Amino acid sequence: MASGADSKGDDLSTAILKQKNRPNRLIVDEAINEDNSVVSLSQPKMDELQLFRGDTVLLKGKKRREAVCIVLSDDTCSDEKIRMNRVVRNNLRVHLGDVISIQPCPDVKYGKRIHVLPIDDTVEGITGNLFEVYLKPYFLEAYRPIRKGDIFLVRGGMRAVEFKVVETDPSPYCIVAPDTVIHCEGEPIKREDEEESLNEVGYDDIGGCRKQLAQIKEMVELPLRHPALFKAIGVKPPRGILLYGPPGTGKTLIARAVANETGAFFFLINGPEIMSKLAGESESNLRKAFEEAEKNAPAIIFIDELDAIAPKREKTHGEVERRIVSQLLTLMDGLKQRAHVIVMAATNRPNSIDPALRRFGRFDREVDIGIPDATGRLEILQIHTKNMKLADDVDLEQVANETHGHVGADLAALCSEAALQAIRKKMDLIDLEDETIDAEVMNSLAVTMDDFRWALSQSNPSALRETVVEVPQVTWEDIGGLEDVKRELQDLVQYPVEHPDKFLKFGMTPSKGVLFYGPPGCGKTLLAKAIANECQANFISIKGPELLTMWFGESEANVREIFDKARQAAPCVLFFDELDSIAKARGGNIGDGGGAADRVINQILTEMDGMSTKKNVFIIGATNRPDIIDPAILRPGRLDQLIYIPLPDEKSRVAILKANLRKSPVAKDVDLEFLAKMTNGFSGADLTEICQRACKLAIRESIESEIRRERERQTNPSAMEVEEDDPVPEIRRDHFEEAMRFARRSVSDNDIRKYEMFAQTLQQSRGFGSFRFPSGNQGGAGPSQGSGGGTGGSVYTEDNDDDLYG
């Protein structure tokens, strides 16, 4: 039942975004008739709207744009569509497939005079009289309706010229009759000024926050457009909206879009600009802004960076800030009832704003504009790429899935980076010195998926800029052996990120974390890196000792910050290396500054529990002293799975050697299996060291032989004409034999016994290996070895002391 209610509530919250179906709402379609003043409808639709052929109609498009046209009937047009050509579409700021409304406009007067100006780049190099060649034939006997602000295109004399209607009398629209005076004197209009008004932001240019847009629309547009609604129901319309969220999510953009779409007077106050050095002037600046807005109501006042002018009063030492906050409070209370002034503010630090501002009646609605999810990111990418030339192989959905934690600004940067990369590929054809670039080159430019791939590798989300989150370049192939551990990790991290639907189906929240423990040099850190790389999650690595600082309370704040960042960039893997340095058992360590270490542990414990389940944040801890870690961290729900990473057995050692030597040329007669057999008890790091040393020896030999050959060439130039082979083409057996002389085991048997004991005690405390349900359902056999049983049974079952590395 609850889910039904939820879905209903969901529908209501975005109800304002739905287009209402009315007979005069029509879908824009491409025109057959190329005339700029004509739109065509189907005959049944014209009858329904009571229009006749040749009537003047008023069309309303996006961003409050209007146009007047003559309507004709067209039998090929379907009932719900309206055909209009590109000029009309541009004047209405609509694209094909958008919805516009149409209404009859019977009282259009004949114009006394109109003033049109050409747009500069379309009249370059044209000689002769513009009026005679273009305007006169265009308007002759046509009785065209025009509206102030329209741009129309006239073809004639081999060229097409665009004109803009600057003024009409009577305003704002009229019909150009034969006796209308047409002025076309004056400077041509610059294209740039036109483009700017074309690039106004509308709701279509905002992706990834549908719900928030709906909230803002009902808070801003309803009171401004239909104040009677609120009067009828007897409540005061809301006064203020506070938009908050991480930087780059589009707070200022939303405010701009609202201003453009509502057509309200928009007054922008940038926080820091109000401040003035003269006493009392900062407040009067604020007062002036509010007075100005009230004069021009309906109006929207937008305060950007609110935290700059309204910080908490008890925290600030400056007298000016306090007075400004008080002034803002009184102004917002004293906005005359229904003065149709709405105050919007944006900040990315909502908690540093004076609490008096956040009560009802001032900023009563706080809209959290968060980091977009995958569908939101797809919307944003589509908006940014709608003017880009994309190759056919570009899969924006995949790009959206791979950009976890990116906000709108990051995605915009990603698109421009990809486009730049596409240009770089053609750089050999482009000459900077040339005046123009070949049209061929221009037309061949297209952004491919590879360009996006490259841009993806370059960009990281802005939420994580200071903790540089690199997805490591380590794959499963770099890790030899440890098959069971890899499986376990995939279950833990990859599945919740890649198949969240399965977890919903079985009603399970994914587990939060794992602890790797085992002797040093067995690849604990490497595993964590590989898992972050495999599932394309963000990866924050935290070195234990770095969290502790000398200042009181700072260490805990560091922990909080790290967890906040991880939540913002979810899915994210938090990797605590050397966990034992910050999570020692509490109470034992006397003498550290006021129990700082204990407080850090407490902070970590609360953060792990309080990690909201919606976010995919995983914690991986690694330690080689599991015995001194606080037991509270090891309980299920925090680090539920304890995975013992043993010394590699023979098979794993072969795999490690192979993984290490993947990129090196090795002689055929080097028997890695024999090498693995001989290195019993060596950890992964020790084996890597052997390989490195063998490589070093080969490199040294190669360099020395080159020097020797160079000397011989100098002493006897004639004899050395013959080009010799490379003296050391690959790593030979003797290099490995030499390297083995220096090889040593870094982990003693004693250490291993300690780990074995720890693993064994864990095993005993959860040893329900023989658990079976009573015989009714023979099928359900219990898990082979307690729920989190480490890496296969082999490690624990062998009792003989000789073979500790099974």
Swiss-Prot record:
Numbered residues of crosslink Glycyl lysine isopeptide (Lys-Gly) (interchain with G-Cter in SUMO2): K8, K18
Phosphotyrosine sites (modified residues): Y805
CDD domains attached to this UniProt entry: RecA-like_CDC48_r1-like (cd19519), RecA-like_CDC48_r2-like (cd19528)
Cross-referenced InterPro entries: AAA+_ATPase (IPR003593), AAA_ATPase_CDC48 (IPR005938), AAA_ATPase_domain (IPR050168), AAA_lid_3 (IPR041569), Asp_de-COase-like_dom_sf (IPR009010), ATPase_AAA_core (IPR003959), ATPase_AAA_CS (IPR003960), Cdc48_dom2 (IPR004201)
Modified residues (N6-acetyllysine): K502, K505, K668, K754
Modified residues (N-acetylalanine): A2
Catalytic reaction equation(s): ATP + H2O = ADP + phosphate + H(+)
Subcellular location: Cytoplasm, Cytosol; Endoplasmic reticulum; Nucleus; Cytoplasm, Stress granule
GO biological process per UniProt: autophagosome maturation; autophagy; cellular response to arsenite ion; cellular response to heat; DNA damage response; DNA repair; double-strand break repair; endoplasmic reticulum stress-induced pre-emptive quality control
Protein name: Transitional endoplasmic reticulum ATPase
